[in-house]
Amino acid sequence: MPFLSTAHLCALLLILGCFYIGRLIKVIPILRFACAGEAEIKPLFIQPKSNDGIHLFVFLGSGGHTGEMLRLLQNHQEVLLNKRNTFYIGYSDDDSKARFLSMVEKYDFKAERIHFYPFAKAREVNAGPIASIVTISKTLLTGFTNVLSIKMNTLGQPHLTLLNGPGTCCIINFWLKLLEWLIYIPYLSNGSNVVYIESLARIESLSLTGKILYLLADVFVVQWEELKVRKAPRSEYYGILV
């Protein structure tokens, strides 16, 4: 006699299917928005419930994107640059890493509280279709190990992910959401907490990365009110942040 009859197996698959469909709705913000019919009101940054600080994953996307992210960190340093925080800094060029280190020198962080993760660029400027496919594939593969490491280190801890700008953010968000969907541990699995901040330069339309992460980021932030009204009703507007 088989361990599970066909009826039992079908019932088990049905239960698992319903569970993961429910998880998918919970994990993908645009699905929650579609089901609820209105945007969730969320604070911009998570507030730690203890004195241990938060685990903060920040991606520096090079050039102007890095500049905006560093200004964001400094403008909200009480929460984001708290000495009790643990930092996971993703970067795609050495200059961005150096700029971050230069910025945090005055805050006297302990070295063990800052962890760096190099990410390959998802797409180079003016790259052709074939070159883009190659770089995206490379970023998918190498990015997974970084995201998995960060995910496991922040499991069960108050944490926040800050993204802005480049296409690599889409890959980071993809892996975070996939792992959140697949890995469910009661009392430890507490979401990805991804905040995506659209560039200050985006006044009338979303960037390509923004259009993708509008569907996937837990909190999607625009810095111009007319952009929220015209193009991104699910987004949050807190004024100019950078």
Swiss-Prot record:
One of its GO terms (molecular function) is protein-membrane adaptor activity. Residues 25-242 are cytoplasmic. It is found in: Endoplasmic reticulum membrane; Nucleus membrane. Pfam families: Alg14. Keywords: Endoplasmic reticulum, Membrane, Nucleus, Transmembrane, Transmembrane helix. It comes from the Eukaryota. It is a single-pass membrane protein. Belongs to the ALG14 family. PANTHER family: GLYCOSYL TRANSFERASE-RELATED (PTHR12154), UDP-N-ACETYLGLUCOSAMINE TRANSFERASE SUBUNIT ALG14 HOMOLOG (PTHR12154:SF4). Involved in protein N-glycosylation. Essential for the second step of the dolichol-linked oligosaccharide pathway. Anchors the catalytic subunit ALG13 to the ER. This is UDP-N-acetylglucosamine transferase subunit ALG14. The lineage of its organism: Eukaryota, Fungi, Dikarya, Ascomycota, Saccharomycotina.
